[in-house]
Amino acid sequence: MSNTTMRDDAIAIWTAGVEAVKPQQLIRSSVRCEGQVMTIDHQKIDLSQIRKIAVVGAGKASAAMAESLETALGDDLLKEKKVHGWINVPADCMRPLKKIHLHAARPASVNEPTEDGVYGAKKILQIVSQCCQEDLVICLISGGGSALLPCPVEAITLSEKQRVTRFLSASGANINELNTVRKRLSLVKGGQLAIASKAGLLVSLIISDVIGDPLDIIASGLTAEDKGNFQDARDVLDKFSAGPEEVSASLLEFISHKASEENSFRPEFPGNVFNHVIGNNMVASAAAHEGSGPRRFPANRSCR
C-alpha cells in the first residue's frame, strides 16, 4: 500500500467520524416532525397537546443544534407552538436564528464562567419557571455547557466559584471531582434546571463529551437526577487540602454548613424529564470504521 493511499484512507476514516457527530447531522437523525407528532429518538410527542415550546441550553455545539432544531420543526410549528428560547454559547458561535436567542456567554478563547454566562443562566431559569403544564421544554446540551451556564448560589460569588475551580484543576482533580463541587455551588447544575422547570414535559438532547455518557457529569448534569451531596463536595475539598488560603473561607463555611444539614429537605426529581444522548464517541468511532470502506481495517474501539 502506497503512502498516498494510506494517507487518503486515513483522511476518509477521520472525516467519516467527524461528519457523523456534527450537530446538524445528529439533530437530523434524531428529530423528526410529521404533522403534530414529534419523534426524538424513539420518544413520540403529541404536539397537539402542547401550547408552547421553549428551547434552552448551553454548549459549544448548542448553537448548531438550535439552528438544526428550528429546521426540523419547520416554519409552521415554529409559529403555531410559539417557539422561543435562550442558549448560552461561546462568542464565536453566534448566528441569527428565527426564534431561539443565542447569547454570547463567554469569549471564544476563555473556557471559564463569566458574568455574561450568569446573566444568560438567569434568563434560562426565568424561561423554564414561567412555563406551564401544557408547555414543552427542549434542552440542548453539549460540551462546555458547565462553564457556559454558571449560576452560583446566593451565598457564593462567581469569583469564589472560579477560584475553587482553578485550584482543583491545578491540583489534579478529575472532571467527576470538579463537578461534585461545582454542582453544590450552582442553581442550575445537578438536575436543578429540570427541577426549576414548570413545563409538563422536558426533553434534553445531549451530545456527550464524557466517556461512558454519565448524564450527571455531562455539563454537570443540568437535567439529570443527582445522587451527590454536600459531604461529597467537602470530601473532595479535603482530599486536595483546600483551605482558606486556597479557596474562600465563605465557600468552605457554606459547604461545611450544608454538609451538616444533609438530612434537610431535598426536592424530588421530576418524573417528566427525558434525556437522550444523541451523539458520543461511539457514534464517531462506528462511523470512522464504516469510513474505512472496502478495506475494513481491523478496529479496536474502546470507550473506557
Predicted features and spans:
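N-terminal loops that bind phosphate or other acidic moieties
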Residues: 1-304
